[in-house]
Amino acid sequence: MKNRNNAVGPQIRAKKPKASKTVPILAGLSLGAGLQTATQYFAHSFQYQAGLGWNINHVYTPWSILQWAGKWYGQYPDDFMRAASMGMVVSTVGLLGTAVTQMVKANTGKANDYLHGSARWADKKDIQAAGLLPRPRTVVELVSGKHPPTSSGVYVGGWQDKDGKFHYLRHNGPEHVLTYAPTRSGKGVGLVVPTLLSWAHSAVITDLKGELWALTAGWRKKHARNKVVRFEPASAQGSACWNPLDEIRLGTEYEVGDVQNLATLIVDPDGKGLESHWQKTSQALLVGVILHALYKAKNEGTPATLPSVDGMLADPNRDVGELWMEMTTYGHVDGQNHPAVGSAARDMMDRPEEESGSVLSTAKSYLALYRDPVVARNVSKSDFRIKQLMHHDDPVSLFIVTQPNDKARLRPLVRVMVNMIVRLLADKMDFENGRPVAHYKHRLLMMLDEFPSLGKLEILQESLAFVAGYGIKCYLICQDINQLKSRETGYGHDESITSNCHVQNAYPPNRVETAEHLSKLTGTTTIVKEQITTSGRRTSALLGNVSRTFQEVQRPLLTPDECLRMPGPKKSADGSIEEAGDMVVYVAGYPAIYGKQPLYFKDPIFQARAAVPAPKVSDKLIQTATVEEGEGITI
């Protein structure tokens, strides 16, 4: 009969179990016992005479009977036959017992631990293999007295070993991280703050209310030697300035594409695509007007800004027809009219008055944000450039701060910035000896909290598959799977973000859909179910029969209900977290980790780092920028 396949999945590569040696050992012992019995019986028959040879308290070696038979069988054949008979009886009984053992073993069912699934919780070796814990010390390190290897990278959770000792789980690979954590669950104090208080490279941080700036900017500037930039568009003081139009590669063949992508982001603030006729036509209009503003400002020596573009379209002292005429006759390049600018103006002149008015009003509505004098001032010039995030002499930490009441209206501007960061910093790759060569000075961590609230950023979803090769590591945080997969505000059910995140971690969810997703990620395991059946008369003192059966059944290693009931953090009366809750961590290719949430304020090192006061003024990098003609961004 062909051997059955009891190893499935990854177990197919596991070492095959060695054949049991129980039966051969029992058979050998049975034969040995027979020889020993025959020897002792023969010696007893001759009163343990000295001529029988060496012994210990009248106990002889088992093979002595064979030696004696060679010498004296001819003289005492009957005595030898009686001794042999006794030995054969003992050996026969032993061999019969061995045969029964083999029969019982052959007829006993063997449990298949992998029948319905082989999921299990990770142990320390699994976590070390996944790269979340430092590897154990080698023999050379032990002998030489070298310090044990330390972990580094972003914090993805914590884990308690069998002795109750807490270990931080950190990931330093180029792969991305995706976190599911409901609001007020402790993700900030457990994952974001520890990461920003230890990551020494460049970083882009979306910071709601400015809490992360207050807790981490001081340490990052003073001890991590970062330039810290606070971009808060709606703040009247303390914010760095950044003009998106400064990133356009004006005067190159890429200028039209750059402006087209910028205009698309302006008229599509939610990331739903250009669905209506008015969006498409207003996007085409903005392309022409922005290019016209850029060239006119360049020729006149004044800066081009989005507020100035809005001013062109909404100038109360000038008829809009004069603008269209100016765009068709102005000498943009070497005294010649720019074809993209002239075409956009001609389209508006050829439209019926009602249609052109609707297109114009639609375009102006998308620029209304820049009529706020505070926002207009903060986007009127650039104190830093996008490329400096990874190419400056020092690492750069960019905090994008939005207050809750300004979050919705500032979303289009934040979307423009995130889009530009991805497109500019992942623009080229050099190779040497068939391997990519780093063309950047500093790695970049994109810590995007509540990133689905920015709307669908198609470039972010697409770029996750390749930006790791450019030194960009994304740490994406969302509330639950529904927020991520929402068709209206998220990336839809066919999103590829989860596919491109090597590490996923989760705090206790609030929605059953997220719990079901986490349960599937954890996997299915096989457990043995015991069933006891009794029979007999109800009035009898003893039951007639009791039978026990065992059956392998499947169950999720973590059911959705168990996931929803994972212990969360314990909070005080005012809502402050006092004790950490549980969490789960998933690393592709390894068993799931049932972990413990870290808390930065429980660690004296993190407490000391968070106590470093944040700078009162944002750093400005533009003085050190050397921007050549035509250098800009692909957006």
Swiss-Prot record:
So where does this one cross the membrane?
A: 23-39, 83-100
Keywords of the record, alphabetical order, are:
Cell inner membrane, Cell membrane, Conjugation, DNA-binding, Membrane, Plasmid, Transmembrane, Transmembrane helix
Cytoplasmic face of the membrane: 1-22, 101-635
Per the UniProt topology annotation, the Periplasmic ranges are: 40-82
According to the UniProt entry, the coiled-coil residues are none
Task: Name the Gene3D superfamilies on file.
Answer: P-loop containing nucleotide triphosphate hydrolases (3.40.50.300)
What happens upon changing residue 209 to T?
Answer: Decrease in transfer activity
Listed GO MF terms: DNA binding
What Pfam families does this protein's entry cite? T4SS-DNA_transf
Task: Give the membrane topology.
Answer: Multi-pass membrane protein
Q: Which domain of life is it from?
A: Bacteria
UniProt keyword Protein transport present: no
- Give the GO cellular component terms, alphabetically: plasma membrane
The record gives the effect of mutating residue 456 to T as:
No change in transfer activity
Subcellular localization = Cell inner membrane
Mainly resides where? membrane
Q: Which PANTHER family does the record associate with it?
A: CONJUGATIVE TRANSFER: DNA TRANSPORT
Q: Which family does it belong to?
A: Belongs to the VirD4/TraG family.
Subunit composition?
A: May form multimers of at least 18 subunits.
Q: What does this protein do?
A: Required for conjugative transfer of plasmid RP4. Binds tightly and specifically to the relaxase TraI. Can also bind to DNA without sequence specificity. May form a pore-like structure that could serve as a channel for DNA transfer.
Can you name this protein? Conjugal transfer protein TraG
What species does this protein belong to?
Escherichia coli
Provide the taxonomic classification.
Bacteria, Pseudomonadati, Pseudomonadota, Gammaproteobacteria, Enterobacterales
